[in-house]
Each structure stands twice: as C-alpha cells, then as structure tokens.
C-alpha cells in the first residue's frame, strides 16, 4: 500500500524498453503491447503511513503505460489479503477492501503540438497523483488529489529523471481536520538507473521521494496525551529499490524512510481504547515484491 513504483512498473515507466536483451523475433507475449500490467504479492514491514507501525502481505494489480501524450502508473491493492499484524486491518478483517493510487500525466508538448523543451527539461506534463482508500466507514476512507506540473529531465547520464510539483485537494482523510479543502503541496522526484545484467535478468536501482509541505493539518489538530500536536504540516517518504526484472517475472527489495509519515507527529502519545502508545512515524521500513507481468 502507498508505495508507488515498487516493482517492475518503476523500471518500465521510467525507461522505454520492456524487454532485456531480447531479439526482435524472440520477444515475450503480453495481453497488450502498450498497457503493461502485472499481478504482485507484496510483503511490507514497519510501514509508517499511520499512527501505528504496520506489517502485512497483500495482493496487488499494477499497470503502467507511455503512449503518445499519455503517461501512466497505478496500482490497486487488496490490503492484508494474505495476513498481517494485529494493527493491520484489510479485506478479510473489517478493514479496507481496496487501496489504490494512480499517477496519470498528460504531455503538454504533444497535446499542443509545441516543443516546450529548454535546457535539460525535455518535456512538460499536466501531472496528477490520486489516492483512494475505500475503507468500511468514514474514519477508514481517504480521497486525495494532487495536481500540478511535471517534467522529464535529460541528465546526460545513463539514468532517467522526472520531477512533479503539485497542489493538494483533500476530500476524505480518515476524519482528519483538513477534509474537503485545498491543503498543502507535494514535490516528487523519481529516478531510474540500470545497473547490470544479473542471473539472466536486469538489475536496476529506482528511487523516489515525496516531500509534502504547506499543510494546515498540524496547526488545526489537537494535542496528544503528552502535550505535543498529534499531526504535522509536513512529511517525507523516500524509497530506494533494487529490482531484478525478467520478461515475465520481477523481484524487488525496497527500503523506505519516513519522516512524520502520513503527517502523524512522531512520538505523539495516543490511546485508541487499548492503552497508551507512542506514534512511530519516523524511521525505516521495507517491502519485498514478487510479480508476474502479463
């Protein structure tokens, strides 16, 4: 959940090649030659998007595409499909049956038939990032739309680099104080670096970081038991991925760092009815991903 570009989609969405060293007459077969998709099993450890640390294993559908003026990445998760810790609620145990995130970008250059490139900036996009958590009640639902400007950057190196900056409109947010209003901004940077051929596949490094700032959520939220604010105005999530990709199978190991993840104030003391606990929203967690491209 909430991982964005964890598996082979990261490699393929940021690069133009889908196969690795495949001859033209020996390419693998997929359902579509432009809509690339996979089904994944994802194991998460110590994720920090909420007030309590979460571990779970879930099923995921992932898709990515880049065709003419349309650039897309997205996924849909069935949370806790294969189980999780006591704080992880999902499809089978009265939690959310669906969590999804999509990142469509629309090329301004191609839609206007205008070359807007200059310096290292190759192409410009109307960039979007939409997040939806279905939940089973109001306190379990989220609907967030980031919208803004994106670009691809020529680094002169064997790597791909893109940046997006967004304004955020917050609809539902698990009952938080910033619902149904414009509330803050996000800067996203993504990069992809091919490393080497390994064991018949391609080993790559993918990184992306979300910087969220300018929200009023911290100011508008109440105090925790220990006197500090329960929420924050800013947060950071930074992911670092090693991905091994084959024609149909892909494997990823992900390390992610959160600073006040989900805009929860680290060390705030809370009680949800089962005793006091301290928020641990700053620190490291990780994911393991196994997926099949079809």
Curated annotation (Swiss-Prot):
Residues 1-22 form the signal peptide. GO terms for cellular component: cell outer membrane; pore complex. The keyword Transferase does not apply. GO terms for molecular function: nucleoside-specific channel forming porin activity. GO terms for biological process: monoatomic ion transport; nucleoside transport; symbiont entry into host cell. Keywords: Cell outer membrane, Ion transport, Membrane, Porin, Signal, Transmembrane, Transmembrane beta strand, Transport. Functions as a substrate-specific channel for nucleosides and deoxynucleosides. Has a greater affinity for deoxynucleosides than for nucleosides, and does not transport free bases. In addition, constitutes the receptor for colicin K and phage T6. (Microbial infection) Serves as a receptor for CdiA-STECO31, required for adhesion between E.coli expressing CdiA-STECO31 and this strain. NCBIfam families: PRK15106.1. This is Nucleoside-specific channel-forming protein Tsx. It comes from Escherichia coli (strain K12). The lineage of its organism: Bacteria, Pseudomonadati, Pseudomonadota, Gammaproteobacteria, Enterobacterales. The gene is tsx.
């Amino acid at each position: 959940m909430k991982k964005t570009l964890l598996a082979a989609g990261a490699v393929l969405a940021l690069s133009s090649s889908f196969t690795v060293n495949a001859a033209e007459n020996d390419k693998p077969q997929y359902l579509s030659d432009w809509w690339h998709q996979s089904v994944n099993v994802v194991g998460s450890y110590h994720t920090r998007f909420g007030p309590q640390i979460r571990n779970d294993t879930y099923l995921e559908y992932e898709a990515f595409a880049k065709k003419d003026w349309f650039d897309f990445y997205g996924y849909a998760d069935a949370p806790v499909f294969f189980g999780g810790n006591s704080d992880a609620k999902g499809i089978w145990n009265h939690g959310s049956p669906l969590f999804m995130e999509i990142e469509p970008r629309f090329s301004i250059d191609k839609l206007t038939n205008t070359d807007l490139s200059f310096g290292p900036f190759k192409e410009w996009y109307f960039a979007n990032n939409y997040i939806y958590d279905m939940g089973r009640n109001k306190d379990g639902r989220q609907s967030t739309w980031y919208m803004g400007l994106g670009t691809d950057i020529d680094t002169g190196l064997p790597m791909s680099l893109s940046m997006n900056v967004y304004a955020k409109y917050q609809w539902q947010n698990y009952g938080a104080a910033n619902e149904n209003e414009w509330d803050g901004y996000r800067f996203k940077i993504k990069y992809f670096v091919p490393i080497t051929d390994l064991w018949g596949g391609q080993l790559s490094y993918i990184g992306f970081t979300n910087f969220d700032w300018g929200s009023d959520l911290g100011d508008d939220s109440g105090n925790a038991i220990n006197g500090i604010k329960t929420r924050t105005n800013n947060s950071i999530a930074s992911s670092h991925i090693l991905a091994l990709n084959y024609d149909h199978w892909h494997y990823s190991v992900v390390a992610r760092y959160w600073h006040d993840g989900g805009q929860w104030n680290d060390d705030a003391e809370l009680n949800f009815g089962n005793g006091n606990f301290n928020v641990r929203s700053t620190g490291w967690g990780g994911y393991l991903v196994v997926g099949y491209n079809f």
